[in-house]
Amino acid sequence: MSTSYQVVTYTGPFGFIKPWTAVRDELTYSQQFLTPSTIEGMRQKLGVLEICRYRLTHDGFSVQGETTQSAGIDRKTVKKRQEVTYQRATAVLDRGVMLNPRLHLAFPSQDDAQKAHRQHLCLSRNEDVVMPGGPIRYRSEYEFNDTPGSKLRYEKGDDALMVGYSRYKNGAPMYGTLDITGDPVSADRASR
């Protein structure tokens, strides 16, 4: 017997999922998958028992400048006026932001899907809000397997990448392999 899911699709105008390796890199593109701790955070925020699977698609990237301030404070003394000023150094970092991200979350029950369908999510940062759109869709496991998009298959092995540390498992390393079905860029444009 095949597993079936109740699928809620979230959409938004843009989204940036900060890679765990990017601290103050001059140019950083959004991660195109969700880590185990991100999914766990979403599960807790939605108040559901389980998020079984997900797929993430988008329409491409837009590089946008983001002004940041350093943690340190510079002290500057102007001797003529006997004036002391304090400033924080600024820099502009370029971010490759996903345009029109679509996040398909698969739930095991209609109850969890309905609960999720009434709430918004943030992909990673508070400003990257995605809202549920369209009806809750029933999908068999086979249909969901064919859904275009990218996801991280949570596993540790020779081909696995380290994708960060889990805030929910005492900082344990998280590993996975990227799983791409179809074209994750503009894959849903026709079906929106």
Describe every region a protein language model picked out.
Residues 1-26, 177-185:
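N-terminal, Lys/Arg- and Ser/Thr-rich interaction peptides
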Residues 5, 51, 100-102:
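Extracellular structured ligand-interaction cores
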Residues 10-14, 58-60, 107-113:
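Beta-strand elements of well-folded, non-transmembrane domains
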Residues 18, 64, 115:
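Short acidic, gly/pro-rich beta-turn/loop elements at beta-sheet edges
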Residues 30-34:
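Acidic, low-complexity glycine/serine/threonine-rich segments
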Residues 36-66:
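Short, well-structured hydrophobic secondary-structure segments
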Residues 67-192:
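Internal, well-folded beta-alpha domain core
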